[in-house]
């Protein structure tokens, strides 16, 4: 049995039903008939509402579109995996030996899902307000400065607006290569403009690499802004 008391201390919440916490920590590779997918589904809905309400009250002058972008920047696999790592959540997840040997304890998707499942479990046992309090504490601890300008890093859209407006061209993103093991896959993206390479970036997802390449391109095209 894993020392889940340490996890409870980090969460600042002690489960009355320990089996519920174990359920939230059980990956489908460990036991297909008893895993955390349903709790993950619930936790995802809870977190979506918690963060949405938080942003609604924090950014009182922002339009719906900006609030949606802010929520998307916080409610995602990367952000949840960061929070999960702050809890050392990988140490507590039950998974098959094969999955563990494949780097399962470091996979952002597994960590993110487990965090959502835990929030779902807290909601089931203690109610929405308890889940909300814990979720916000974890969010603010890992993202102490929730700034709209920092979070909404949609460099691709900004670059496209500039290039279309100034030179009538739309940037193209080409995958140069994908490399590394499955759980640490990296993607190299080349940003092409008018048939010429303008920037190149490497990241853990195509989307992130494209955003990084767009940011580099924006810096190069600073005179167009």
From Swiss-Prot:
One of its GO terms (biological process) is tRNA processing. Keywords: Cytoplasm, Endonuclease, Hydrolase, Magnesium, Metal-binding, mRNA processing, Nuclease, RNA-binding, rRNA processing, rRNA-binding, tRNA processing. It is found in: Cytoplasm. Its cofactor is Mg(2+). Residues 4-127 form the RNase III domain. The active site is at residues 44, 116. It is an enzyme of class 3 (hydrolase). One of its GO terms (molecular function) is ribonuclease III activity. Residues 154-223 form the DRBM domain. It catalyses: Endonucleolytic cleavage to 5'-phosphomonoester. One of its GO terms (cellular component) is cytoplasm. Mg(2+) binds at residues 40, 113, 116. Its EC number is 3.1.26.3. Digests double-stranded RNA. Involved in the processing of primary rRNA transcript to yield the immediate precursors to the large and small rRNAs (23S and 16S). Processes some mRNAs, and tRNAs when they are encoded in the rRNA operon. Processes pre-crRNA and tracrRNA of type II CRISPR loci if present in the organism. PANTHER family: RIBONUCLEASE 3 (PTHR11207:SF0), RIBONUCLEASE III (PTHR11207). Homodimer. Belongs to the ribonuclease III family. This is Ribonuclease 3. It comes from Campylobacter jejuni subsp. doylei (strain ATCC BAA-1458 / RM4099 / 269.97). The gene is rnc.
């Amino acid at each position: 049995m894993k020392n889940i008391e340490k996890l409870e201390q980090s969460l600042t919440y002690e489960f009355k039903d320990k089996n519920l916490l174990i359920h939230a920590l059980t990956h489908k590779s460990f036991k297909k008939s008893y895993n955390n997918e349903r709790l993950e589904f619930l936790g995802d809905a809870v977190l979506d509402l918690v963060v949405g309400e938080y942003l609604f009250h924090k950014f009182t002058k922002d339009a719906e579109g900006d609030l949606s972008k802010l929520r998307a920047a916080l409610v995602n696999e990367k952000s949840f995996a960061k929070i999960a790592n702050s809890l050392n959540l990988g140490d507590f997840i039950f998974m098959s030996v094969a999955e563990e040997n494949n780097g399962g304890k470091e996979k952002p998707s597994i960590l993110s899902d487990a965090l959502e499942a835990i929030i779902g479990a807290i909601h089931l046992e203690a109610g929405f307000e308890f889940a909300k309090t814990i979720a916000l504490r974890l969010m603010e601890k890992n993202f102490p400065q929730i700034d709209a300008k920092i979070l909404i890093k949609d460099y691709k859209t900004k670059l496209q607006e500039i290039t279309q407006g100034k030179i009538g061209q739309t940037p193209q993103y080409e995958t140069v290569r994908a490399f590394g093991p499955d759980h640490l896959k990296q993607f190299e993206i080349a940003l092409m403009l008018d048939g010429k390479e303008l920037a190149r970036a490497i990241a853990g997802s195509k989307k992130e690499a494209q955003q990084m390449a767009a940011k580099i391109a924006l810096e190069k095209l600073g005179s167009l802004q």
